[in-house]
């Protein structure tokens, strides 16, 4: 599923942590990621609040932040993955198995569109999740690489009024891409007191137009 996994990671962190807790980034957190994968430029030894880590996770899709948050909550990524699977089962997911907090390629890390919709539905009921996920850009606290505090920007184009694919009513969601998963996209939109969740998996550059088509159909035909 790639980085849409991070919706579940964020939900668990929000349920387990205070936003002001401090997270220390280990060598493993920072460097145990695929080369060239999404990052917020956080380095070994940096210390950030859970809040800043969540903004890095959900806006910049930072894999080092996913690792650090998982270890902060559970002591290891493996233990955190157990929490992820337990939470998914509790939400009614039946076709998923999560093996890491970031969504990077792993043959034992998989989900379904329906399961991701269930996870997203739970996440958008959390006010802090909505605040973080709906933010356009955010300035992180100072780190080694960015002593003035770096900025992270939301990758989800349907939430950005300046993008051609902006969708009126869209208020939350997450992008994802890996070579194995293709383009993945979770989007939540609200219109006339109805909220719809669209999930596109293994997209091939049409994930935004596919999501628009799903929303247009849903809002036209359901009430």
Which residue stretches match the model-derived regions?
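Active-site-adjacent loops and short helices of periplasmic peptidoglycan-processing enzymes
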Residues: 1-114, 121-127
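Domain-terminus/edge residues, biased toward the C-terminal soluble/receptor-binding domains
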Residues: 93-94, 105-223
């Amino acid at each position: 599923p790639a980085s849409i996994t991070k919706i579940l990671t964020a939900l668990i962190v929000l349920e387990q942590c205070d936003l002001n807790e401090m997270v220390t980034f280990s060598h493993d957190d920072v460097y145990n990621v695929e080369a060239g994968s999404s990052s917020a430029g956080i380095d070994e030894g940096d210390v950030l609040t859970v809040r800043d880590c969540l903004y890095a996770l959900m806006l910049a899709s930072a894999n080092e932040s996913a690792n650090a948050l998982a270890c902060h909550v559970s002591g290891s990524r493996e233990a955190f993955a157990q929490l992820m699977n337990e939470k998914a089962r509790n939400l009614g997911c039946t076709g998923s198995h999560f093996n890491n907090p970031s969504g990077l390629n792993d043959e034992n890390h998989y989900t379904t569109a329906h399961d991701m919709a269930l996870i997203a539905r739970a996440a958008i009921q959390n006010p802090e999740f909505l605040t973080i996920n709906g933010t356009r850009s955010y300035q992180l606290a100072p780190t080694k690489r960015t002593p003035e505090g770096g900025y992270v920007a939301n990758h989800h184009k349907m939430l950005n009024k300046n993008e051609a694919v902006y969708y009126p009513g869209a208020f939350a969601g997450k992008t994802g891409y890996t070579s194995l998963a293709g383009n993945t996209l979770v989007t939540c939109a609200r219109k006339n007191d109805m909220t719809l969740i669209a999930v596109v998996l293994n997209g091939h550059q049409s994930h935004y137009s596919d999501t628009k088509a799903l929303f247009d159909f849903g809002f036209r035909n359901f009430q």
